[in-house]
Amino acid sequence: MYFMIEHVLQTQKEEKFLKPKKMYVSTPYSRVQAVEDRLKVIFEEEFKSEGSILIGYNPSIISKLAKYLSGHISKPASIGIAGETASGKSTITLDIIDTIKSFATEFEIDDAVTRVNTDDYYYDRSDMVKAAGSFSEFAKNYDLDVPQALELELMSSHIKQLLMGKAVYLPKYDMSGTAIRYDNYTLANPSKIIISEGLFTLTEKIKDAFDFKIYVDVRSEVQKERFFVRAAERDLGESANGIYENASKKAEIYVRPCKFEADIVLSGEAVRARYKAFLNKLIGIVQQENFKNRLIV
C-alpha cells in the first residue's frame, strides 16, 4: 500500500524512507533527471498555490511519471480515478480526456486515449428488476453501493488486454433503471493511455490494473450539496435521503480508504480550468521531449 503524504514530510527519517529511488538504466540520466526536476517544480508550485488542485501526492510518483513523459518507458499507461459520488471525478476525468485528445489532434497522434467506464461493469440484474416490478423496489433489497455489485475482475482483464495491445469488446450498462448490461457492446482499441473512473476503481480487485492511481476528495458538506442537487434533477424525491445515507455509509467502508492507495489526491473543489492548466504543463514536457521540432500554434 502506498502511504499518501500531505506534501511536506515531518521528519528526516520519513523523508529518507519515502524518497523515490532513481533507477535510470537505458535512458541517459540527464534527460530523465531533467524531466523529474521539472515535475518537482510543477507539483511544488501547484501544491503551494491558492485554490490548488493538489491535496497530496506520493513523492515516488514524480520519478515514475518522469520515466513515462521522457520516453524512458514507452509502453501504454493506465490511470484509475476514484472518489465518492458527487466528488467531481467524472468531470475531472472528462477534462483529462479532452485535454489529451486536443494535444493528440494537434500532433496527429492516433489512438491517444481509451476510456473504460467502471459503471458499465455492474452485473446485469434486469430479471430482478422485472420481478420486483420497478427499479426503485429492486433497489430496496439490492445494494449498488458496494464493489461486489460490479464484475471488477472482468474490468481488470479488459484493461490489461488493452495495455498488451489487444482490442476488447466492452460492456454497456443501462443507467436508466432497467439494470440491463449489454456485453460485448463497444469495441475498444488499444491506445497510449487507458483511463477509468468510478466509485470502486481503486478497490482491491481492480487497483493493480492501474499504473497511476488518483483519488478525488471533497469536503462532506460540498459533496452532500452536490448530491441533492443531482437528486432533484433526477426527481428522486424523498428517496434521496435514504440513497445518500446508504451511499455515505458504504463509502466509509469501500471508497474513502482508497485515498491511501492513491499516488495523487486531487481536490474536487478547484476551479475547473486549473485541472486542464496543470495537465497542459505535463503535456508541455511531452511536447519538448518528443516533438521538439513541432510547435503548437
Locate the predicted segments by residue.
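Glycine-rich phosphate-binding loop used to anchor ATP phosphates in small-molecule kinases
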Residues: 151-208, 255
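Hydrophobic positions on the alpha1 helix immediately C-terminal to the Walker A/P-loop
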Residues: 92
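Hydrophobic anchor at the beta1->P-loop junction of P-loop NTPases
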Residues: 81
